[in-house]
Amino acid sequence: MNNFPACFSALILTITIACPVAVSQEQKPVDIGSRRELFVDQFLIEKLDKAWLQQGTPRDEGIALKFDKPWEGLFCGYVTIIQDGAVIRAYYRGSPKAGADGNSNESYCCAESKDGKIWTKPELTGFDHEGVKTNRVLANAAPITHNFCPFIDKKPGVPASERYKAIGGTMTSGLIALKSADGLKWEKIRSEPIISKAMVPFPYMFDSQNVPFWSEAENKYLCYFRVFKDGIRRIVRSESDDFINWTKPVLMEYTSGNNKSPIEHLYTNQTSPYFRAPHHYVAISARFMPNRRVLNDEQAKAIKVDPGYFKDTSDAIMMSTRPVEGKAHASIYDRTFLEGFVRGGVGAQNWVSRTNYPALNIIQTGPAEMSFYVNQDYAQPTSHLRRYSLRLDGLGSLHANYQGGEMTSKPFIFNGNALSINFSTSAAGGVLFELQDTTGKAIPGFELKDCQEQIGNEIDRIVTWKKGADLGMLAGKPIKLRVSLHDADLYSFKFHKP
């Protein structure tokens, strides 16, 4: 566990030191409109001086859902969380026995919640177990039930009968498409796969949770799915206008700031639009470390893990991608943070194969809180889904310590008349803002010295200067944003009309 590759240390150093990012003065300003910008990458950053991007720290909120029904069991996995109005649903594979991918023991189950914290299992008709109603939405549908992955189709004009869509399948079957009006009763869109083995130029594929969704930012369907390249579990991206006809998949590459990122086994990708900033696709992914054994035979026996599932280990990492910024960005995951996002917890049960796998999607669970979920204790009698929370937008932040630091953005154009920030300071800390022209010269009236220091902890605060908060006269004009902060974090910002 202590053999940390030297190359990782070198890459992480490039993130934590002040590292100016060069930009040409002729570069076309980015039009950010009134969208919210997160601090999970360096896309908008021109220069950092004694400030850095810092990964958020999820809080363990405990067990959300136990996989304790006879048709669920040790090998439950590939979880998707969907919020549909007042109802939140968790879809997950039920699999009480180990077996080949797509075996007949696999089904798909559903749990429901009103707040994302307390979950119940509905009694549904259609897939009884020994005469008892179950919470299964799919059964006797192998191999779809190996990795069924649903979403709400938000494409304008979609028929009510197809409001929900999903895919599932293995390399043998290809990815089969399904539809549903209510997310509970499903049928195939067609018998043939929408993405077949023949379409994918890699030797192995689909052995994972393969993620489809409608992108409001790109106005198309996307599918991020797993392949093997050079023996490594990798991710590819495919596009579609109609959910039936898909483009040749493109291999996703990884960067970390201005550097290439290590290529690691990513078992699941869990890429989805962030709900408060859908041009940011966030991927809380399962990082798999094959043959990196932690437990000895005695420890494995004590936790009753299946003997075939304790000789590797895994954790969760966080990536992001911005394909809306152009083709050059579409095939790149930004791994600004190479460190684990969710580490294995205390106890042998957290250090087995295929545990700590994140569920798909992040949801809001409080006025200032959002949650995601992680599949834990895999292949053990205690198999369950665990909830982790963060502050809204708290995946990453612009951070400076007590001594202080600064960030200067690249040129951008905004729409709106006020700057809203999500931030936190200590009692001694603070944040100041300055608006500049594209040469870096402060715009009169919006200089750092004229800004009211922002002190406190708020999700949405309007920044003011001595002359007020109105920025309408600068809307549509290229500007830069300078941020000076000490003992503080800035989680996001946006320009809008309050």
Task: Please name every model-derived segment.
Residues 1-11:
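Bacterial N-terminal signal peptides that target proteins for export
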